[in-house]
């Protein structure tokens, strides 16, 4: 059995049975019942049950692998999902690979399959022991090193690909906007990183200021902004020593789940030069279809170039909503059919909202919060109607009623 923080982790038959029988139970409730089950290591059981519950949705491949052990709650919450790990694996290949910030090992487990030799480096002893236990069960032959990633980097032999997932070091969970707020500090290590690997893949928080990151780092050749079901999850930077093209390609990815075992992605790629130089047609006419770019595109700031890639017009420079007279099936974001448009006069709203008790409300460039506007409109959350409160190119404020376009076709 692996050693965890100096103690032998022994899962007795009773504890294993308890974990299996309580797979769906509320772990907070179970933790209070330890005295009722003296033969069960309740502390360990609760950790394993909670880990499995998170893994079922987040990392199904791991969930369906028997015998895996899970770490404490924080490590599970912070680890990558299977969808984002699979995407990262699609960006790398070669002979040798090293993960300098191993963590729970999910990213390493998916990327390592693309290499002959893989090394996992982690300074927390517990996570190293879990990796030693779990990797063989996943059919992986990965060398585990209980060591600080920066120290390992200094003495390691060069590899084809290096991976880092710097952690926030603000100590209180506050908003992080700069690479220097993370540990290890990639900006301080950049020259050494590109000396040690042909390609360096860096995973950063989506809260990071992308423009600032590109100013801080001189070897970035690609940016990948990854969302899952329209929630921005990761900012990935690919660094290479030579050559670095003058224009960095920015890839906006939105994972929409899997069909028949194949993962479905929305993808939109552009450069900052394309964004700067693109004409952006504006309109104050709300046409038949309305589009909201996915979270990755909004994070990337690809507002103008979208109008060149797709036959759409923007409702306002700051609204980030687009319209077209005809349906554009492959637009990378949410797509709606417009049913009605209203101003905010009392009579207009009364007619517009007649018979409507609930709706999904979104604010875009509008002087109110969702909560305040929902209260004003006296609408509950949910239903099949979608309302967008926004500002048009002529500065008029409107409420746009829509239905999801995909459900109508």
Task: Tell where the protein language model's regions lie, with residue ranges.
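SAM-dependent transferase fold signal centered on methyltransferase-like domains
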Residues: 1-409
């Amino acid at each position: 059995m692996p050693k965890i923080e100096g103690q032998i982790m022994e899962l007795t038959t009773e504890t294993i049975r308890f974990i299996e029988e309580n797979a769906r139970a509320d772990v907070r409730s179970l933790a209070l019942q330890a005295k009722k089950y003296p033969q069960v290591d309740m502390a360990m059981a609760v950790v394993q049950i909670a880990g499995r519950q998170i893994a079922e949705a987040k990392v199904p491949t791991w969930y369906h692998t028997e015998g895996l052990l899970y770490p404490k709650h924080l490590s599970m919450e912070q680890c990558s999902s299977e969808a984002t790990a699979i995407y990262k694996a699609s960006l790398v290949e070669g002979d040798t690979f090293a993960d300098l910030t191993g963590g729970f090992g999910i990213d390493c487990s998916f990327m390592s399959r693309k290499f002959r030799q893989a090394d996992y480096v982690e300074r927390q002893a517990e996570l190293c022991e879990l990796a030693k236990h779990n990797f063989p069960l996943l059919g992986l032959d990965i060398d585990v090193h209980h060591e600080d990633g920066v120290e390992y980097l200094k003495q390691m032999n060069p590899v084809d690909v290096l991976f880092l997932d710097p952690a926030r070091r603000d100590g209180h969970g506050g908003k992080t906007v700069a690479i220097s707020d993370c540990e290890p500090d990639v900006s301080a290590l950049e020259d050494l990183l590109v000396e040690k690997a042909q390609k360096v893949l860096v995973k950063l928080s989506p809260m990071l200021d992308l423009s600032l990151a590109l100013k801080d780092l001189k070897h970035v050749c690609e940016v990948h902004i990854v969302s899952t079901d329209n929630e921005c999850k990761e900012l990935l930077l690919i660094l290479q020593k030579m050559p670095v093209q003058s224009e960095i390609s920015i890839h906006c990815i939105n994972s929409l789940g899997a069909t028949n075992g194949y993962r479905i992605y929305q993808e939109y790629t552009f450069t900052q030069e394309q964004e700067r130089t693109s004409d952006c047609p504006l309109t104050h006419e709300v046409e038949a279809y309305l589009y909201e770019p996915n979270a990755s595109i909004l994070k990337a700031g690809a507002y103008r170039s979208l109008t060149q890639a797709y036959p759409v017009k923007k409702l306002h420079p700051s609204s980030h909503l687009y319209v077209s007279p005809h349906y554009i099936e492959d637009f990378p974001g949410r797509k709606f059919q417009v049913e009605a448009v209203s101003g905010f006069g009392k009579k207009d709203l009364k007619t517009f909202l007649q018979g409507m008790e609930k709706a999904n409300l979104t604010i875009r460039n509008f002087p109110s919060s969702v909560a305040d506007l929902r209260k004003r409109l006296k609408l509950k959350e949910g239903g099949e109607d979608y309302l967008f409160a926004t500002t048009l190119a002529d500065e008029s404020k409107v409420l746009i009623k829509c239905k999801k376009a995909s459900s109508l076709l």
